[in-house]
Swiss-Prot record:
Keywords: DNA-directed RNA polymerase, Nucleotidyltransferase, Transcription, Transferase. Its EC number is 2.7.7.6. It comes from Herminiimonas arsenicoxydans. Belongs to the RNA polymerase subunit omega family. GO terms for molecular function: DNA binding; DNA-directed RNA polymerase activity. This is DNA-directed RNA polymerase subunit omega. SUPFAM superfamilies: RPB6/omega subunit-like (SSF63562). NCBIfam families: rpoZ (TIGR00690). Promotes RNA polymerase assembly. Latches the N- and C-terminal regions of the beta' subunit thereby facilitating its interaction with the beta and alpha subunits.
Amino acid sequence: MARITIEDCLKQIPNRFQLTLCATYRARQLLQGHTPKVDAKDKPTVIALREIAAGHVGIEMLKKVPS
């Protein structure tokens, strides 16, 4: 079972709303076939949160969102 906490992610992205948007966008990227930056044994949402907590993905995800 995945043991990732929101507190770990909030250390990287302090705004919980931006955190939600970043995790959502990254999870969608993973579903589209992008390569995970951490161990990929979990669902895309959990992988996205793990990447954020590890510092591999950050607020820059919001700048990549197509308008």
